[in-house]
Amino acid sequence: MSKIVDDGEGDTIFAIDRVSEEILIKFIDREIASHVPIVLIAEGLDGGKVVLPRGSSESEAVWRIIVDPIDGTRGLMYQKRSAWILTGIAPNLGDDTKLSDIEFAIQTEIPLVKQHLSDTVWAFRGQGAKAERFNRLTGEITSIDLRPSSSESIEQGFAMISRFFPGVRDVLAEIDEEIVRGALGSPISGKAQCFEDQYISTGGQLYELIAGHDRFVADIRPLLAKAMSERGLDLSICCHPYDLCTELIARELSVIVTDENGLPLSSRLSNETDVAWVGYANRSIRDQIEPHLQSSIRKRGMLRD
């Protein structure tokens, strides 16, 4: 399942991804497209999207459904962390349909083999969010209450800049250090001011914010293009709209999700767009962290137009 089967645009496609995409198309075609025409957007599809049922035109579609069949493939392949099935549904506004147009989102945990519990979280715009936990040993499903952290500081909490892959991890670490130093001051002898968790799954990171496990997460990899170019390197894999198609859930639970400029996410629903995003558990955390984050990336000339 860890064999690479496609390394084109978007993320690397592993064998496990290919299997999930085939199942996805059949499921959407049978359960949804048999009732209403839709545009399915997912990595691995020819051209990045397909209109279902077959033979329908894109202009006829009522909905655009963007899916990441397995977000967190690498951690799941090696049985390190759960992965997630991410789905966002927006009215079909053509190619200009954006993340901000998504009306319904759902993410479902794909547990490790040794793990018997898995969560599903979903939200309709303006109606809050709900969550359930499934016990695959007993078949029992129970409602769970997920709440973001109410802490007013990142001190003694999980807070991090994502730096999953090589290239400019040193730059990202410098930014991380500047933010923490600005927010918490100099390290104290024998103490850990805050901690990090490099969860290679955007859906997983959003879940950690939703569940109150993380207080601050920023994935600003797209802003590193210049720094990598100066080193003679190409920009490596970044976050894409399908990775963020469930951010509606986080917002419905009062998690603050922005782009690098502090604005709501507004990327078009596509497979190629590189997206930078920042998540804060609450307003106090944003007030504590955002000025230092903005200062750090601005002084490096990293902000995009």
Where are these regions (language model features)?
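An extended, acidic
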Residues: 56-57, 100-102, 108-305
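Hydrophobic alpha-helical membrane context
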Residues: 29, 80-83, 217
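Short, conserved micro-motifs enriched in small and acidic residues
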Residues: 11-19, 77-80, 200-203, 237-244
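A short glycine/serine-rich beta->alpha loop
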Residues: 7-13, 71-75, 194-196, 234-237
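N-terminal subdomain of lithium-sensitive/metallo-dependent phosphomonoesterases centered on the IMPase/IPPase/PAP
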Residues: 1-70, 256, 283-285, 290-305
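DPxDG-like acidic metal-binding loop motif
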Residues: 58-126
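Alpha-helix termini
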Residues: 29-37, 91-97, 112-113, 182-190
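Buried hydrophobic packing segments
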Residues: 24, 28, 85, 89, ...
